[in-house]
């Protein structure tokens, strides 16, 4: 996997095969970041990369000038993110925590929150996550982006704004 643009653009990040993740493809990541950068300049924005997995989405935001925190429960993923940040000479905060617990107790507000929960999440879990983030953790002009399996449809949720599909992977945007 690689970082697409910015300070670390073109840099390859080795993701161990034993991590319990499904990394976002470079094509999907590039497409999503084209959408995001058309909406705003990412420099100095506060970003939360939740259910971080490999940390590649957060690293892409960092490379483009954003201030990013990572929230990941899995110890192997957590250690990988910490190691990768160290290799890049970065000191961003990485929280080893359940995402719901972190968000419920955090008083931080973010410009963007990226969430890539397990595909086995139920509709109710997605709904709980969306409501929590939009009502508590996003700035008033902030945006929540959820990566999910294509079969999931969130268009009936009032905070839903748009959806983009890339193969079996979809991204839904909420405000």
What annotation goes with each model-predicted range?
Residues 1-175:
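Class I S-adenosyl-L-methionine-dependent methyltransferase catalytic core
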């Amino acid at each position: 996997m690689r970082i697409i643009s910015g300070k670390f653009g073109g840099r390859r990040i080795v993701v161990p095969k034993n991590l319990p993740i499904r990394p976002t493809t470079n094509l999907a990541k590039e497409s999503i970041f084209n959408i995001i950068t058309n909406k705003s300049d990412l420099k100095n924005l506060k970003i939360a990369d939740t259910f971080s997995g490999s940390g590649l989405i957060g690293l892409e935001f960092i490379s483009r000038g954003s201030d990013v925190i990572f929230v990941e429960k899995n110890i192997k993923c957590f250690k990988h993110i910490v190691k990768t940040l160290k290799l890049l000479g970065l000191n961003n905060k990485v929280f080893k925590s359940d995402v719901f617990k972190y968000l419920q107790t955090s008083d931080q507000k973010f410009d963007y929150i990226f969430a890539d929960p397990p595909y086995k999440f139920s509709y109710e879990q997605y709904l709980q996550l969306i409501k929590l983030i939009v009502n508590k953790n996003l700035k008033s002009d902030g945006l929540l982006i959820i990566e999910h399996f294509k079969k999931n449809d969130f268009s009936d949720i009032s905070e839903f704004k748009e959806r983009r599909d890339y193969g079996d992977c979809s991204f839904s945007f909420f405000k």
